[in-house]
Each structure stands twice: as structure tokens, then as C-alpha cells.
């Protein structure tokens, strides 16, 4: 198995630097006006952390880059939880305003190389439209988009370079118990229920339905956040891509 690991605090890691180089090489070969990187993975897998590190490294190299998160495009509570769909499919189909995310952010930049998005979106903490999302990026820049279920078949072709992060279900739950208690005020019982009944089975459904590994350029094991490991295709198929 091919492994590359390094600490991710402080100076850019070897892995982040390699990813940035691969992204720039791909961008040069594509010759597009707008270049979109997708960072996909389970909840608590480190998507935001990696996306920020990539933006920082690309910016250091003189490339205008911004991060956009699908978490800023949550649907209202009654949409996420009030559907007639089973809970597994509620997360998959109803968690995010994918129409606005794709048609307002991803597609405009991918096709035109210009992004001017300024809209008040839902703040899921209060279930109110008070979260102003402003995203601006011009021609020649790189948009690093991150979020859950990012590489769905319906719009995966809009991503020019795709990264899939992997963590085990046990690691995901352990991180969620800490994060959701500290940041979202959830009890241990609530967190365990959400992940066992909604998020874990939903991601398994996503792996079966959309096979994100098929379109990911790289798969990274983030079980140890300070030592991420780049997996080769065989190892990725064995540990990260099976539902």
C-alpha cells in the first residue's frame, strides 16, 4: 500500500503540498476558466480542515482560492426531518438545498469562471434565515468546495479534482460525540441516535448509490487527523469504498 503521511499543523504538509501540485497540474491540462476542487467524506472526517489547508497553500502559491461549504446550504428543520422518506434517505435527499448550491455556486464558476454569490441562507442552529453567505472569485481562481455527499452522480462532472476522505464509523462517532456536544449542545444519546439511524446508514447508501470512489482522484484515510494517509486504489476499495 502506498502511504504518505505527515503532521498537518504548522507548515504545509507534504500531502497538502502534493495535492496542491496535482490540482495545479490538472488545471493547466484542462484549460478551463473556472476550476473546482471537491472535498467529500463522512461527517467529522476533516473536510473543512483539508479544504482550508488547500486554500492556504494555493494562495501561498499565488492562486486566488476560496472555500465553499455545502453546510451553508442546509434546508429547514421540517424539510430535513419532516419527509415521508425513511431517515436514511432524508439525509441523502433533503439535508441540503442542492439546487442553490449547484446552480448558484458550483455550476456558475465551473462553466463561466466567475462567482458572485450573496444570499441569506438558513442557520440550522436556530432554523432561521440569518446566515449571509458571500462567495466571490474571478477568472483564474480555484474554488475548493467541501461537504457531505458531494460527488453524487448527478453533478460530479462539475468537479475537476475530487478528494474523498475516509474514517471508520467508530472514529466518526467518537469525534461526533465531542463536536456535537461542544458546538451543538447535543446529548450523548441524541448523537448516538443521529449517527446510528441517520448519518452512518445514509453514507452507506451514498457509497452504494453513487460510488464516489469511482470518480475520486485521491482517497485519504483521516483516522489520525495529524497523520493523514493517501491510499492507493486497492486499499481505498477495501477500506473506504465498501458500504
Regions found by a protein language model. Name each.
Residues 50:
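Hydrophobic positions on the alpha1 helix immediately C-terminal to the Walker A/P-loop
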Residues 66, 75-125:
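Conserved nucleotide-sensing/catalytic segment adjacent to the nucleotide-binding pocket
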Amino acid at each position: 500500500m502506498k502511504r504518505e503521511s505527515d503532521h498537518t499543523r504548522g507548515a504545509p504538509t507534504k500531502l497538502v503540498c502534493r495535492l496542491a501540485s496535482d490540482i495545479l497540474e490538472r488545471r493547466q491540462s484542462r484549460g478551463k476558466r473556472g476550476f473546482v476542487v471537491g472535498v467529500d467524506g463522512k461527517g467529522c472526517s476533516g473536510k473543512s480542515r483539508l479544504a482550508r489547508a488547500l486554500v492556504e497553500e494555493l494562495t501561498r502559491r499565488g492562486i486566488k482560492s476560496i472555500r465553499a461549504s455545502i453546510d451553508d446550504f442546509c434546508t429547514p428543520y421540517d424539510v430535513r426531518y419532516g419527509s415521508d422518506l425513511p431517515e436514511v434517505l432524508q439525509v441523502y435527499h433533503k439535508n441540503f438545498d442542492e439546487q442553490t448550491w449547484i446552480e448558484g455556486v458550483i455550476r456558475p464558476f465551473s462553466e463561466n469562471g466567475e462567482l458572485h454569490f450573496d444570499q441569506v441562507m438558513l442557520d440550522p442552529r436556530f432554523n432561521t434565515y440569518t446566515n449571509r453567505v458571500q462567495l466571490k472569485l474571478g477568472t483564474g481562481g480555484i474554488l475548493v468546495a467541501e461537504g457531505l455527499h458531494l460527488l453524487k452522480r448527478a453533478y460530479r462532472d462539475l468537479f475537476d479534482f475530487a478528494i474523498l476522505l475516509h474514517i471508520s464509523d467508530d472514529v466518526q462517532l467518537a469525534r461526533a460525540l465531542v463536536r456535537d456536544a461542544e458546538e451543538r449542545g447535543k446529548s450523548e444519546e441524541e448523537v448516538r441516535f443521529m449517527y446510528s439511524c441517520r448519518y452512518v446508514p445514509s453514507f452507506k447508501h451514498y457509497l452504494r448509490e453513487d460510488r464516489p470512489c469511482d470518480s475520486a482522484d485521491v482517497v485519504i484515510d483521516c483516522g489520525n487527523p495529524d497523520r493523514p494517509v493517501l491510499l492507493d486504489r486497492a486499499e481505498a476499495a477495501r477500506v473506504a469504498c465498501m458500504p
